[in-house]
């Protein structure tokens, strides 16, 4: 079914991939935080744990009472979450607590985390909860227990979210240790976690000098209030398995019926990311063609007979554009994305997908070879056309608009900026005496200042006045824009050095509800 490539060469097929201590990574960490500090930080934010979840019926014990924060406070008060003391407390409790009770408790805490990340965003706390789980639950149940497999995968996901890759891998090694012959269990989530941990399918960890340069340039062009929403990704060491081991896994997933029947869009998106990481572009193209009937020559075909048909989603298309972008082929990537949109018009593409697409189009844009910015323009128009096709207005997204503004500023294209204001901001702001869209307002002010400054620099003062009259969102905004226009057209006497400083930062020095934000 699949042609040979460097990935699918002629290779032996022993056991899938066994646990090994060689899967190790180091991570750059901040100053150590004690468990007690972490717990106190959490608990100080909570006055009453019952405000988080209200039980619907009487409960049998504290761990399953649907008040996980209250239970966490109790354990911290009794044992400070020390593994031996907590395990002993649970084991000999008068409530006769079971491993299942602790599993419920941990999953309730994870649910709290998913709803309010800042509340439980403490690695030390989760590390203690995991080690308690390992002793109180894993050691007490049989190998291959479905509950344990699910929970351990949840711990892996948690430590990935907390940027603790070594600990996530340690948890996964426990999964392999408890599985038959040390093989990866035939379980979708476990396979997906393996792809993330060991096969490069965490594109957010693809930090290169190119990506760091991109973020530094972006922050430089968006200095001020809006720059706070942009962060240079911290570097995390991310060693992955070699090509031969990846070959082995891929053949299992594609050709072994026991594994191929598990395919879903999440697994496909991770496989595509992994292929991008390993720079297997020929096989990447082949994979998309066989399983989705798409290729970069704008050819749309039926998927291969007998292959499980899946409808792509935002996550899968994010992986496609990231894989192509990572291999310096963003133009082909956007062509493939366009073919996906044509073949699968029922897809629901969310803002995170468009954010990723705009990001890669800018990151791979060479302003010296492509002075017109054809790649960023194509990505932007692709988004506009998509929303027009489905009959929806373009939704506001802070990062997308800041990416876009940095591009327009580099080209001094105020006409495109005016169109953006009409297409994106018009539906958000209603002219009132006091508009309260804070984040949107910050970005709109940046657009307004850029447009006004550019028009003044081109002696288009009449157009500038028209723009101010049309796009003032309230009295305060209008008064500020008029004052800014007067400053530009009637400059005060100042030194050349001071003028330079003002030019660098005045795009983001504006009032918000009477306050100067810097």
Curated annotation (Swiss-Prot):
Residues 1-15 form a transit peptide. Keywords: Mitochondrion, RNA-binding, Transit peptide, Translation regulation. InterPro entries: ATPase_expression_mit (IPR024319). GO terms for biological process: regulation of translation. Its main location: mitochondrion. The keyword Transit peptide applies. One of its GO terms (molecular function) is RNA binding. The keyword RNA-binding applies. One of its GO terms (cellular component) is mitochondrion. It holds the Pfam family ATP13. It is found in: Mitochondrion. Belongs to the AEP2 family. Binds to the 5'UTR of the OLI1 mRNA. Required for translation of the mitochondrial OLI1 transcript coding for the mitochondrial ATP synthase subunit 9. This is ATPase expression protein 2, mitochondrial.
């Amino acid at each position: 079914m699949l042609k040979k490539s460097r990935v699918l060469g002629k290779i032996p097929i022993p056991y899938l991939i066994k646990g090994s201590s060689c899967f190790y990574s180091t991570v750059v960490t901040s100053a150590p935080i004690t468990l007690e500090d972490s717990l106190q930080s959490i608990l100080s934010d909570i006055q009453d744990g019952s405000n988080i979840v209200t039980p619907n019926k009487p409960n049998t014990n504290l761990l399953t009472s649907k008040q996980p924060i209250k239970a966490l406070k109790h354990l911290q008060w009794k044992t400070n979450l020390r593994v031996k003391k907590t395990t002993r407390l649970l084991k000999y409790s008068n409530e006769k607590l079971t491993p299942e009770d602790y599993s419920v408790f941990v999953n309730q805490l994870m649910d709290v985390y998913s709803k309010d990340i800042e509340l439980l965003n403490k690695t030390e706390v989760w590390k203690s909860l995991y080690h308690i789980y390992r002793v109180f639950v894993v050691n007490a149940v049989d190998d291959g227990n479905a509950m344990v497999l699910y929970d351990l995968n949840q711990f892996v996901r948690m430590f990935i979210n907390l940027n603790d890759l070594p600990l996530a891998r340690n948890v996964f090694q426990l999964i392999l240790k408890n599985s038959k012959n040390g093989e990866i269990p035939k379980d979708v989530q476990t396979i997906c976690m393996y792809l993330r941990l060991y096969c490069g399918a965490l594109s957010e960890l693809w930090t290169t000098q190119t990506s760091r340069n991109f973020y530094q340039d972006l922050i430089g062009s968006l200095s001020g209030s809006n720059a706070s929403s942009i962060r240079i990704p911290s570097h995390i060491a991310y060693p992955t398995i070699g090509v031969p081991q990846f070959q082995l896994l891929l053949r299992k997933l594609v050709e072994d019926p026991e594994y191929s029947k598990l395919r879903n869009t999440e697994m496909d998106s991770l496989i595509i990311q992994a292929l991008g990481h390993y720079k297997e572009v020929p096989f990447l193209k082949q994979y998309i063609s066989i399983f989705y009937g798409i290729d970069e020559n704008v050819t749309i075909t039926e998927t291969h007979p007998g292959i499980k048909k899946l409808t792509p989603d935002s996550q899968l298309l994010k992986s496609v554009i990231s894989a192509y972008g990572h291999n310096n082929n963003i133009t082909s990537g956007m062509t493939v994305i366009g073919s996906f949109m044509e073949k699968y018009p029922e897809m629901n593409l969310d803002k995170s997908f468009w954010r990723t697409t705009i990001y890669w189009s800018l990151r791979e844009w060479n302003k010296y070879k492509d002075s017109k910015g054809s790649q960023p323009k194509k990505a932007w128009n692709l988004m506009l056309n998509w929303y027009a096709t489905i009959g929806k207005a373009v939704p506001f997204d802070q990062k997308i608009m800041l990416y876009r503004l940095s591009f327009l500023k580099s080209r001094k294209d105020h006409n495109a900026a005016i169109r953006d204001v009409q297409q994106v901001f018009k539906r958000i702001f209603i002219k009132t005496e006091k508009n309260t869209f804070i984040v949107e307002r910050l970005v709109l002010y940046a657009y307004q200042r850029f447009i006004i400054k550019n028009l003044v620099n081109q002696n288009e003062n009449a157009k500038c006045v028209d723009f101010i009259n049309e796009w003032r969102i309230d009295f305060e905004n209008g008064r500020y824009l008029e004052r800014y226009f007067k400053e530009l057209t009637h400059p005060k006497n100042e030194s050349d050095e001071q003028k330079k400083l003002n030019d660098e930062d005045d795009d983001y020095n504006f009032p918000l509800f009477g306050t100067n934000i810097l």
